[in-house]
Amino acid sequence: KATLTVYAAGSGSLTAAWVGAAGQSVHQYSGDRVTTIDLGDVPKDASALKITADTKVTADVTVSRDGNGNQSDFALIGAAQTDDRSAAVIPSGLDGRVSVVNASLSSKQMHMTGYDDKGAAVGEKTITVDAGAAASFDASDLGKNVFAVAADGKGLAWGVRLSSSAVSDAKLAGIAYIGATPLMPLQERIWARSDMT
């Protein structure tokens, strides 16, 4: 199940559409307050959620899953950014599935490199994502023992869904997601002026 949380300074309406799956819905939100929207079950083929709003909004989505014995788990996923260079780390003992989303109106490419825990590159691939579409692959497709994934490319957002075979085999609910972290250097400008007095 998915719940969308939205904050905006002014009231308006938004369209929520699942990328990779059919269907969209329109919702109203109120200004200067948090609005919670129940999106129901996540479609099986969905890779991302695209939000189009009347005004500037801050949004995140909470995804939950139920397991055996009334056990459940959830993940809070913030809005993704498109950075020219970014990376994500896959915790030891977990498997990662990389999802890349193109919310633009034109096809775009991203070059991705996998690194092991010693910082050595173990594999790379370039993927092309059509406009308004998404692509996904297992981090292990980049090579053995992938500990981190780095990406170069403009206009694409991506992240890694984590999973554990031990959790799945125990029929427990487990859901986790790591968004890409920008690697672009922070810049700051300092103005200096001579004191003429």
What residue ranges belong to the model's regions?
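Generic structural motif
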Residues: A9-S11, V19-A21, V42, D54-K56, ...
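Short, tandemly repeated low-complexity microdomains enriched for cysteine and small residues
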Residues: T15-G20, S25-D32, D60-R65, F74, ...
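A broad, low-amplitude sensor of folded, mature protein cores
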Residues: S30, L49-D54, Q71-R85, V101-A103, ...
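Intrinsically disordered/low-complexity terminal segments and short unstructured peptides
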Residues: A2-L4, L14, Q24, V34-T35, ...
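Short, structured motif recognition centered on aromatic/hydrophobic residues
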Residues: T3-V6, L14-A16, A48-I51, R97-V101, ...
